[in-house]
Amino acid sequence: MTEQRLLTPDEFEAALRAKGAFYHIHHPYHIAMHNGEATREQIQGWVANRFYYQTSIPIKDAAIMANCPHPEVRRQWVQRILDHDGYDGSEGGIEAWLRLGEAVGLSRESLLSEERVLPGVRFAVDAYVNFARRACWEEAACSSLTELFAPQIHQARLDSWPQHYTWIEAEGYDYFRSRLNQARRDVEHGLSLALEYCNTMERQQRMLEILQFKLDILWSMLDAMTMAYTLDRAPYHTVTREAVWHKRRLV
């Protein structure tokens, strides 16, 4: 058994980046979407369920800011909320995602109602938001380090989806384009916080576990979608074909 020790900053960054092997880009559901093998229902299901994640991100970021006592950090972190909620002449990522929904044939009303959000997806996303509320702000902030791997997945969608899914309207891809630069900027900030905060072996190991927790969330979301849209085993499928599960935020 290898003895654990305090990693150098370069070694710790390498350990964080190595977690990319478990990023949800490698999930069979994502692989199918990338390869043009997903059905219209599977694409729509992903867009509708992922919208719950998108609308929860600024709530998560607000929780981090509420727990952070440092104005200089809050001034930089608030940009993440603005990126999603929009400001002045910028529509924001949530609005861009609504247009993605329309581009794949979903109505804004359907997305905003959360009627399509699967319980497994809701539970996973809510676990992320609740972690951000309860953890110390440094740990909650660094849980966003899955952004280390995000530019790759956004670019992959831009490269493959227009070729495979000609029925998706072109303006729907604006969200992915906007996140290419935003994610890279957020990575620089989040990584610098992690390298500064994780100055003990215990903190480094805990942060690696937190990053794995976030990866588990993203993977579990796709597991829920696989059950519903690939295996045709939506919740309560042995009892009813109706979507009887709860469809609103309860907390």
Swiss-Prot record:
Q: What class of enzyme is it?
A: oxidoreductase
Q: Which reaction does it catalyse?
A: 6-(2-amino-2-carboxyethyl)-7,8-dioxo-1,2,3,4,7,8-hexahydroquinoline-2,4-dicarboxylate + 3 O2 = pyrroloquinoline quinone + 2 H2O2 + 2 H2O + H(+)
**Tell me, what is one Gene Ontology molecular-function annotation carried by this entry?**
pyrroloquinoline-quinone synthase activity
A family per Pfam: TENA_THI-4
Keyword annotations: Oxidoreductase, PQQ biosynthesis
Q: Any keyword Oxidoreductase? A: yes
Q: What is its EC number?
A: 1.3.3.11
Gene3D superfamilies tied to this protein: Heme oxygenase-like
Q: Which superkingdom?
A: Bacteria
Q: What does this chain do?
A: Ring cyclization and eight-electron oxidation of 3a-(2-amino-2-carboxyethyl)-4,5-dioxo-4,5,6,7,8,9-hexahydroquinoline-7,9-dicarboxylic-acid to PQQ.
The family assignment reads:
Belongs to the PqqC family.
Recorded hits in NCBIfam families, A to Z, give: PQQ_syn_pqqC
From the Swiss-Prot or TrEMBL record, give the protein name.
Answer: Pyrroloquinoline-quinone synthase
Gene coding for it: pqqC
